């Protein structure tokens, strides 16, 4: 969703549905892109996080395989036209599952290769998770575009403040 109001749900109520969709999708993506690392990211990957109730997946590939992975994913999923599209990031969506799905195709080591690190920081830092949840609660029912801008600022600040958070090792 790129417009309208932000609506959040209790992640514990949708955890089983998200897990089932992720496992099914992980198998499909692994068959399609056997050299990719496939990670459950986003709020539903973080116990206690406030979420919109969707599933976010990060597909990490080497830069040399990015264009081919992008082509293969574009044959099977809709492009998320509201998201950035660069030489190292492509976004896709799938509304046909039990929960909405967003897929971020990311080149390892590229400028957008921070999704797994952000997930791990949220899992490891109660303080960062609480700040993230507070931001989300503040934006509940308000502009989605403005929320995305503020969320990006918070993520950038938190990652800069925690430079020793382990990078993705896949």
Q: What positions do the PLM features span?
A:
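Catalytic cores of NTP-dependent nucleotidyl/adenyl transfer enzymes across multiple folds
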Residues: 111-170
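Conserved short hydrophobic interaction patches
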Residues: 32, 72-76, 121
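Helical scaffold of the NTase/Pol beta-like nucleotidyltransferase catalytic core
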Residues: 1-39, 170
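Structure-specific DNA junction-binding interface
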Residues: 5, 80, 157
């Amino acid at each position: 969703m790129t417009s309208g109001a932000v609506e959040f749900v209790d992640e514990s109520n949708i955890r089983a549905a998200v897990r089932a969709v992720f496992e099914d999708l992980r198998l499909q993506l692994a068959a399609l892109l056997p050299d990719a690392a496939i990670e459950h990211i986003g709020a539903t990957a973080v116990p206690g996080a406030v979420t919109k109730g969707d599933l976010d997946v990060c597909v990490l590939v080497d830069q040399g395989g990015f264009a081919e992975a992008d082509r293969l994913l574009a044959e099977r999923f809709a492009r998320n036209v509201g998201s950035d599209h660069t030489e190292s990031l492509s976004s896709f969506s799938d509304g046909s599952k039990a929960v909405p799905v967003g897929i971020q195709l990311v080149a390892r080591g590229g400028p957008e290769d921070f999704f797994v690190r952000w997930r791990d920081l949220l899992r490891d830092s109660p303080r960062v998770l609480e700040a993230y949840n507070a931001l989300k609660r503040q934006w509940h029912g308000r502009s989605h575009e403005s929320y995305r801008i503020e969320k990006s600022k918070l993520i950038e600040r938190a990652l800069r403040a925690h430079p020793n958070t382990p990078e993705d090792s896949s």
